[in-house]
From Swiss-Prot:
The keyword Ribosomal protein applies. Residues 161-171, 178-188 have a biased composition (Basic residues). This is Large ribosomal subunit protein eL18. It comes from the Eukaryota. InterPro entries: Ribosomal_eL18 (IPR000039), Ribosomal_uL15/eL18 (IPR021131), Ribosomal_uL15/eL18_sf (IPR036227). GO terms for molecular function: RNA binding; structural constituent of ribosome.
Amino acid sequence: MGIDINHKYDRKVRRTEPRSQDIYLRLLVKVYRFLARRTNSKFSRIILKRLFMSRINLPPISLARVCRFMKKESRKNSIAVVVGTITDDARIFEIPKLKVCALRITEKARGRILKAGGEIITFEKLAEISPTGNKTVLMQGRRNAREAVKHFGPAPGVPHSHTKPLVRSKGRKFERARGRRKSCGYKK
């Protein structure tokens, strides 16, 4: 009797093209696939890889975060590159003059960048200006900022766990006893 071979590890799963059927995204992929092949720069390879990514792995980045990353004196005339969405941040009042390249920019963020005398360019334009990523600052949003990520980790309730419990209801009887009141063990 033969043995069954486990084929679980036979192939390395990685995206070689975007799952999306968006023709504009696929055109961008064509451009950056060419650049990744022909230029000897890591920048184009990273952009290409990120264009393939799922929405979960392309989290939005706030305007405040972009401003903070571009604050350094050495990054004065650089282009901020985001493979994803730039969103507005009401907590920041004044934004500097920025040159930004992103897949999407929300309406308010777009208005604020342009009002500050900034410039918004597309990835096609970026490929013309800087095919090797010269004078660019590549940035991305926090992937662990999602609500779902708070529930990952060691089980809620075990020592030193900061995992958020999955609660079906926020009523009096749910996750409100031990550790939440003095009369039930301890109050944290």
